[in-house]
Amino acid sequence: EQGLIVETDSEFIDKKVINAEKKVFDPQNAEAVYQRAFNLLKKSQYDQAKKAFKNFLKNYPESDFSENAQDWLGDTNFVMQKYDIAINEYQALLSIFPNSKKVSHALLKIGYSYAELGNVSDAEKILIEVVQEYPGTTAARLAEERLRKISVGN
């Protein structure tokens, strides 16, 4: 009788494993999980959004939404004024997605974060990089504005 229970349990476990594997590679499920995290962010539920984005990135690293999730994770920490963590999250985006359209935004926010931490030297260095590497973009314009504020001591 115990053999039957074990066999049934292993069949049940095998089905759970198969279903779990399907979820990991299911793009529709990935989108739904991403959307739930994003909705938490829109509702200003930042701690929950952070957890949801981290969970998403852990479970769906190859998803089309992964670079957005990584960027939002940086933004969430930035809004929460956790600038050191924000810098790390933006640097992760640069490392994992070096060709992303989000690179200029991530660099800009790294510069902003350094400025908020009072690290003017690194802030200026990063913001100048944004201006030079991404001329004519919104990120470059915002970097120039922040550089002007830094130079007058604001």
Predicted regions and their residues:
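Acidic, proline-/serine-/threonine-rich low-complexity intrinsically disordered segments
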Residues: 1-43, 48
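Short solvent-exposed coil/turn linkers within tandem alpha-helical repeat scaffolds
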Residues: 59-65, 96-102, 132-141
